[in-house]
Amino acid sequence: GNETLDKAIVLDQAENTAVTGFVINGGCNYGVYVKNSSSFYLADLDISNVSLKGLCVMGENTGFALVNNSIHENQNGAIFLNGEISNGVIEGNRIENNSGARNLTAGLVLCSMPIEDIETAYNPFPDEMLYDILQSPHQLVVRGNTVAQNHSSGIYSESGYLNYYVENTIYKNEKEGMCLDYGSFGNYITGCEIRQNGGRNRMSDEDLEADFILDQGRMADGSSPAKLPGISLDNTAYNTIYGNIVRDNYGSGIKAVRSAFSNTILCNQIIDNNRGASDTFHFFGIEL
């Protein structure tokens, strides 16, 4: 029939479980939805055209691998991790052309929002102090993924800590290539190529208003002049950005926003950023 299934595949308090080789093409709100599980393996999945998010991991989860999946053309984000999530590997995935222009609809999202209803990835965002955030994704290895042409950021970390981002290729995302935000700390980014991000080319007036930049107008090509960097450090601390290639981004290469404390940026190739310079804005290699 024409009815939309809420979730195509659900793992609920699962242990020692593998899900491999499925193709999910539309017909549901969420492709794969994992809740409070451990020792699970999701591999070689192709998830596209779902109404909301392709793959969600919610609640308390540990000891898992998301490997060689293709998450593409979904309508409101791709991979979404929310909760006390640890000791996992996210490797070799292709995360491409997913819609949704808000921060929490990035290609890969790590966040710490309190989960009032575990059946939805849209719990209300609280107004809370950073020191009250006690459950967020940590001790994850995010390696060798391609994150490209998403309508929001490539990777968005909201309070994630002690995570390792290694050898990822992150390009042509409409917002930042990577954003470490809202108390993210102690993360390590190395060997990544982060290029051609931050153009804000495909955003509606509603999207720009939500980011408080609609009043900046639009450039001749229809994009917003308020371009974004390859890597944004926003209310974050003790991160290491080492040995990456950060090039051809529309805003700055690496930008520290609001509070950015005791971060280490070294041995990176930061080349030909500021592609979106205009009469209104000029950007830099490293902007503090």
Residue locations for each model-derived region?
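Structural detector of coil-to-beta-strand junctions
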Residues: 6-10, 30-33, 53-56, 77-78, ...
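Solenoidal tandem-repeat scaffolds enriched in leucines and small polar residues
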Residues: 73-142, 150-153, 158
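Extracellular beta-strand-rich solenoid/capping regions of secreted or surface-exposed proteins
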Residues: 1-40, 53-60, 81-83, 233
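Core solenoid repeat modules with strong leucine/isoleucine-rich periodicity
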Residues: 169, 179-183, 229-230
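Short "repeat-start/strand-capping" segments in structured domains, especially the N-termini
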Residues: 15-16, 37-41, 60-63, 84-87, ...
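Predominantly extracellular beta-rich ligand-binding scaffolds that present long acidic/polar faces
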Residues: 264-269, 282, 286-288
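Intrinsically disordered, low-complexity Ser/Thr- and acidic-rich flexible linkers and loops
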Residues: 101-103, 111-138, 199-228, 276-283
